Amino acid sequence: MALSYSRRLDQLHRLNGELAEAPDKPVFTDGYVLSGLLSKFKICFDVSWKLMKDILVGELGIVDFPKGSPREVIAISAYNGLIDDDEMWLEMLRLRNELSHIYDGDAAERAARAVMDHYIVALANFEKDMQTREGRGTPRRP
C-alpha cells in the first residue's frame, strides 16, 4: 500500500502542477490545449479517487466496498474525513464521465471553465491534504 500511495501522490503532484499552468495557456483559443486540459483533469481526478481508495483500504482498513466505484469511494472518503466537499467531488465525477461524450466545442469550453474555476483548486487542496497526511508538507489553510 505504501508504494502505491506514494506513487499516486507523486503522480498527483505532477498532474496538479500541470493543471496549475492552465490559466497561462490559450485554453479557449487552441483546441489542442483545451483537449489537453480536459484530459489532464480526467487523469488527475482518477488518480485522486484511487488514492482515496488506497487510504481507505490501507490505512483505515475499510475493505467492504460493494462495488469499489468512484462514487462509493467519494462517499466513504467524505464520511471518514478524507475530503470536505463530497458534492464537489461528485460534480467532478459527473464531468469526468460526461467528457467521454462531449463532441462540441461549446460544451468542451464550459467543461474547461468549470475545471479552471473550481476543480483545479479542489484537486490541489486534496493533494496538499494528502501530502500533509503522509508527512510531506504543511496543511493548507481553509
Question: What are the functions of these language-model segments?
Answer:
Residues 1-142:
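Solvent-exposed interaction patches of small proteins and small membrane subunits
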